[in-house]
Amino acid sequence: MTDTPPMVTPMPKPAEVRVLLFSASLRTDSLNTRLARLARSVLETARATVDWATMSEFDGPSYNQDLETGSGFPPGPRELHRRLEACDAFVIATPEYNASMPGHLKNAIDWVSRIRPQPFNARHGLLLSASPSMAGGNRGLWSLRMPLEHLGARVFPDMFSLAQAHKAFGENGGLADSLLAKRFEENLGAFLDLVEAAKHYPCIKKAWVEFLGEPGGEAVGRVEAA
């Protein structure tokens, strides 16, 4: 009798992950732009296709509903909407201004939130910051996280804040501290793993529930019915 090897179901090939990546700083060589460039290198070395953008591409006038009604959506917010719709996930490296996010970033989010389909909903996001301070711009990330999650974005739990960023980069553009560099790479890798899993397994999508004060029983019922 010939032994027949057991049938093995082949594992699905890794899904291509497309990531929109930009720095919310308007300065060409700001600390956050340098951190975003490093993130780009890590993501492309892994398995992601990176759509690199600059904040100036998405800039627009201060949100005004009269302007929206009279002339529609400005080119910058429409471009951000288009690029978000074309990606599986987004990564934003943002400076902290007075314990909050930059006003121009919030303005872009406010504009884009008015365009349908609303592109942040159910889209994965990772938030990064770099600052000369010991807090690394972390308070700015929390202020950014709130409106994104309100709009339904699946913001990755582990945000990355680079403290004393003016001394953190080596000559090659990487992080001089090897342990910190390892943590940064692992953070981005874990984020990609989650986005990739969400593309393969529908059950991952059911795990993301935004309660927003909703009674627990109703939220559970909504997940089970999904």
What kind of region is each of these model predictions?
Residues 121-164, 179:
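Short, glycine-/small-residue-rich phosphate/pyrophosphate-handling segment
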Residues 119-122, 170-176:
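Glycine-rich NAD(P)-binding loop of Rossmann-like domains
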Residues 1-114, 179-189, 200-226:
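N-terminal beta1-alpha1-beta2 submodule of the flavodoxin-like/Rossmannoid cofactor-binding fold
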